[in-house]
Amino acid sequence: MTPADLAELLRGTAAKVLAERGLDVSVLPETLTVERPRNPEHGDYATNVAMQVAKKVGTNPRELAGWLADALTAAEGIDSADIAGPGFLNIRLAADAQGAIVAKILEAGAAFGAGHTLDGKKINLEFVSANPTGPIHLGGTRWAAVGDALGRILSTQGAAVTREYYFNDHGAQIDRFSRSLIAAAKGEPAPEDGYAGAYIADIAAQVQQQRPDVLDLPAGEQQEVFRSIGVDLMFAHIKRTLHEFGVDFDVYFHENSLFESGAVEKAVETLKDSGNLFQEDGAWWLKSTDFGDDKDRVVIKSDGNAAYIAGDIAYFQDKRSRGFDLCIYMLGADHHGYIGRLKAAAAAFGDDPDTVEVLIGQMVNLVRDGVAVKMSKRAGTVITLDDLVEAIGVDASRYAMIRSSVDSSIDIDLELWTSTGNENPVYYVQYAHARLSAIARNAADLGIAVTDPDFSLLIAEQEGDLIRTLGEYPRVVTSAANLREPHRIARYLEELAGAYHRFYGACRILPQGDEEVGPLHIARLALCDASRQVLANGLALLGVSAPEQM
């Protein structure tokens, strides 16, 4: 019996108890919640439903809890239900009902944890979207890992997810990039507002290989060649780096296409016609304060050029025209102002601002010998995704980026993430999977078949703790999807690995010496198989490998 199964049983029982006493059943929440007590001596699960409902039906919480306890104790799969405090219920499952979680996992396999909370939802998930002016830095690496994991998690809950990369190939930064390439090709210092670093010299050399005559061209043509070929080369490198990191996109959307197609101009005219733009000092402004933004925003500057928000507005309209119910933007720490402006732009078109969701990620620091390594793309000292992977590997890089909430900054300690001990979170989780895989191999070598396990034999404290932890997995995945928090999966996997390691230390799994294979061995092997499956499922959602041996 999973927590969801127990919650369903609890609601049905509560409805019956209220109805039998002529009390209002409609006061019951649609879904009841059961939690694991911090102290396992208090039971397997606890609920405060009696305290939630008692006042609404005119009774005492402890009295209602007593009615519920009597009814639950008589229910199949419940060992006991005890009242605590002002009306809490502490519930213990029967051993066979608790063990049924294991059977459910083995039956579902890779699908265990999948749900339907987002069925029919069409989501556009835009992340990374780094400018094609340099390699992906640590901030972009965080979004690559978190965004990819979030896409996987949303998909498990039934959403149709499109992973999208917004290719910023329009604007002043591309001009600065091309001028930086020209300077490098000529052996001159980078422009003051340009980009520097070895990668600039490398790309400049590649442009010259493709166009040996480029420096002989007139200045305007010269810059266009460096711009066109340089951006293509840089973006090819970005895509290759992301692919090697396990991140691929369904759509690469070019910002420039919004201007070439007239989409920006059309969006601006629509806003003018609706009265949501006003002119002041020669510029056109969006009345974004009318829609909750902290200030009005310039859309068309006084020189007639479009401000950056003009492209954002047209881009959002393009997404909605493609039928997306929800547009999630994953942006860097310096983009807090975008939340209000994007929602205001949606509202100005008569759209629901809740179709826009913005996640803001905080800074990432790489720590070497206890000192944070500074990074600056323009100064040429950028720490890149490639650098991080070279230092600690793909799995550790992804896991390190995902395991913390995106609204907190993180320090990645090279020594920690390359260590082979329990202090390294990804090693700790992967080692649990590898150890479980070794047990499965050893059982196969002994000719042991895991058939018809008797889960009622799994009564040891460590067995119960492991089973209950396994049962939490679907709820964790659902929460991670609904709250857009992939770190919940990582933290859960660490908890599960800990529960497994404690079980492994306390319970002998395989027969030793001349000992015959008994029902308890079979039940414990089934529990191991279920644990291995859930670890593999969770790691897959994070895009991290589940090694068979280490």
From Swiss-Prot:
Belongs to the class-I aminoacyl-tRNA synthetase family. Its main location: cytoplasm. The gene is argS. The keyword Acetylation does not apply. This is Arginine--tRNA ligase. Gene3D superfamilies: Arginyl tRNA synthetase N-terminal domain, HUPs, Isoleucyl-tRNA Synthetase, Domain 1. The keyword Nucleotide-binding applies. Its EC number is 6.1.1.19. Monomer. CDD domains: Anticodon_Ia_Arg, ArgRS_core. GO terms for molecular function: arginine-tRNA ligase activity; ATP binding. A motif ('HIGH' region) lies at residues 130-140. It catalyses: tRNA(Arg) + L-arginine + ATP = L-arginyl-tRNA(Arg) + AMP + diphosphate. Keywords: Aminoacyl-tRNA synthetase, ATP-binding, Cytoplasm, Ligase, Nucleotide-binding, Protein biosynthesis. One of its GO terms (cellular component) is cytoplasm. SUPFAM superfamilies: Anticodon-binding domain of a subclass of class I aminoacyl-tRNA synthetases, Arginyl-tRNA synthetase (ArgRS), N-terminal 'additional' domain, Nucleotidylyl transferase. It comes from the Bacteria. GO terms for biological process: arginyl-tRNA aminoacylation. It holds the Pfam family Arg_tRNA_synt_N. It comes from Rhodococcus opacus (strain B4). NCBIfam families: argS (TIGR00456). It is found in: Cytoplasm.
